[in-house]
């Protein structure tokens, strides 16, 4: 029975209202294991070798309900792991294998993930056996690694630590299209580059259309899209070729007939009795040689369950021409026909299949730079093996953050540059007495309270909980590219850093013992000291928690190009809006708050507190609704909620507003869209009314201190 009625909710009546639901993800407890469950601890108790034995045995245990191609599930699990990790994009760090989100909508129902629902069902007995010790996120990736190893490939390593999600990540912007496998003009900039924050070129596909742009066998356009999409996943040309060539050494694509005529609804739209399985195939037996996935049909070589050089050799040594396959999709066949009927059948090895290539494969050969990499690999098979192993390791771990979060006995000793390495603290950390002395010196320096707070915020607020990058640890704010970002006011930052470095040098040089202070710790300590002073000036005695132990990264440990992806287009907490911001500033504020793992309450108290402290970009007066900036009061909220005033737009673009006295018409204050958000949005106004109450200023101060402290240690994985 279908229910055609629709109960209208708030978002239906007012679809243009700012959506705060992505912040609710940070406040809700939806883990069935409970909020005290420590997955890292559970994983450390896992017998990883036993799990791998179970996985390897399963690889060749073909099931009648979904038989293994060539008697081996390995290629299916490689695709599953790749498509889990491959959703990662550098712009905002979202996507990736963490959370096991491939089993949740919308990714579970993407057209690029057809029949991966069966792969996960094949894994269920193993997940069932190990339970909480092994997350879906880790199992999906581990299955891909074991698949490679079971077919003769030597992987570089494996790290566990991916705690599962149990709800979809609504914060991810997958693109503007409302139909699968489409590409609108709004996905790309005029120069053909993907718009922020997108990483895939087609809605519902991991990277690019395997038939070519817009389903046409355009080699040049395909290579351009590959470079753009893989680049947004932080892969260079060599890594890109290694991944594609390595992955396509195994298995086949499936297009026994036309998908549109034979394949049913995706899992999210399938009938209830299908129990989450989608894409029911009515062609033939619907499985085995009759399987339909992408609509493209055939293997890349004659040894689809064995690691060798045959993919690279076939691609380079034969001439290829486009044709429509049995599924009606564009694919490529050898001009000579030499590889026709040369590969074994998926179920009966006495049957034969044609070897084929995708448009995206032939594009690698056609593009001069990609071809050069292919030829290098052909001449040096060992280099190909090593390049694929490291690129694969990067692919499946890119969203896990620094090496401190990598768990298990197969974690490599080497730390990669993409893990944003940090030096160890080879000195004694500052004690309480030293902390007190340093705070006094910082407050007595030429740096004002707003400058101290602003510098600490600029350092810590680069953190992204999506891929665990950024943050105050490392003091990379003193290195390129961060020290030159417009949002950080380079000239003012330069002066502040000089003061910090002088205080650090004076302290460290004066010590006769092994105690030292890092610049990373000192910057955070400066912000803490300023907040304590600002609270005292408002009549409140607070102690801002401080945990020393941050170290200072070197330029050699910092990939400038990689860190450029962390550059904010806007920071509503500092009332900064960059020229290249393509969304409303209030939307970008919520997006940044979500990346900082903040709730709506956290976001509100932080904005109010930072405004009271005078922390704005360029020392702007926007949002400074107080006569005593630098004092931790709730003036931002009391002024915003005062009905003796009214707001008027002061610019045609409605980015700046004036607060006028209702009686005199005099302009008292100016504010941005971000500032006005806390009075206009009903949810945020409700929170603002709490912090704007006369009886609750102390609550505001304490909540600000608590939230500030959480932001300052978001990247302190060493404390977990």
From Swiss-Prot:
Tryptophyl-tyrosyl-methioninium (Trp-Tyr) (with M-233) crosslink residues: 82-207
Protein name: Catalase-peroxidase
Gene label: katG
Post-translational modification note: Formation of the three residue Trp-Tyr-Met cross-link is important for the catalase, but not the peroxidase activity of the enzyme.
Site (Transition state stabilizer) residue list: 79
UniProt keywords, alphabetically: Heme, Hydrogen peroxide, Iron, Metal-binding, Oxidoreductase, Peroxidase, Plasmid
Matches recorded under HAMAP family: Catal_peroxid
SUPFAM superfamilies: Heme-dependent peroxidases
